[in-house]
Regions:
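A short, conserved alpha-helix within the catalytic core of class I
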Residues: 116-129
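A short acidic, Gly/Pro-enriched loop at the edge of an enzyme's catalytic core
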Residues: 97-108
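Class I SAM-dependent methyltransferase SAM/SAH-binding core
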Residues: 43-47, 51-98
Length: 207
């Protein structure tokens, strides 16, 4: 899918939700469960952040947050959410696959359901996430596993875009894996992520 096709695809989805938030306004639960990692003043990057739910929550914790998002429709809603919550986020209209990732700039890199990337693109995206992280910093990643195709409660339909523990262990083998778990849970994240889901969560520290 081209950059413009992807932008139109996601903008149409966010626009169709109307005043509602497609993925809700509450932070992702796996990210929330890692709150012990967060310190005020840390620099955080939230990739393909959508309508701002995760970036805004991080900013509420006192972090200095940059959030990338491909869809201008989603960014407008994200800015509205940040204003309503009284926080500031540096929202960047950018394709996560093409954004210029600064070297060793962030203490925390967050990727929540960023499974739009095909395998070749995913490898490059993961390398950029690793490179932009400061030594000692952490990547927090949440995605769906292939079993999610049995449930159909969210996520991509292409099995090659889904994560397994083996895939992430290989991709982040040069990091310290503080958490890597496949599990099933009920999701209630806005209109798009609802119901029983097959999930994987990872926390990887740059050493």
């Amino acid at each position: 899918m081209s950059h413009h096709d992807a932008q139109d695809f996601w903008s149409d989805k966010y626009r169709a939700a109307g005043q509602a938030y497609l993925f809700g306004t509450a932070p992702n639960r796996f990210l929330q469960s890692q709150s012990a990692l967060l310190l005020p003043g840390q620099r955080a990057l939230s990739i393909a952040d959508g309508e701002g739910r995760n970036a805004v929550w991080l900013a509420e914790r006192g972090l200095d947050v940059t959030a990338t998002e491909l869809s201008p429709v989603a960014l407008d809603k994200a800015a509205t959410l940040a204003a309503a919550r009284g926080v500031s986020v540096d929202f960047a209209l950018a394709d996560a696959l093409r954004w210029t990732y600064p070297d060793e700039a962030f203490d925390l890199v967050v990727g929540i359901f960023i499974q739009f990337a095909a395998p070749d693109e995913r490898r490059a995206l993961f390398e950029n996430m690793k490179r932009t992280l400061k030594p000692g910093g952490c990547i927090v990643l949440q995605g769906y596993t292939p079993k999610q195709l049995d449930y159909g409660t969210g996520g991509p339909s292409a099995v090659e875009n889904l994560y397994t523990a083996a895939l992430l262990r290989d991709a982040f083998g040069d990091f310290e894996l503080e958490c890597l778990q496949e599990y099933e849970s009920e999701l209630d994240e806005g209109l798009a992520h609802r119901g029983h889901s097959a999930l994987i969560g990872m926390v990887a520290r740059k050493v």
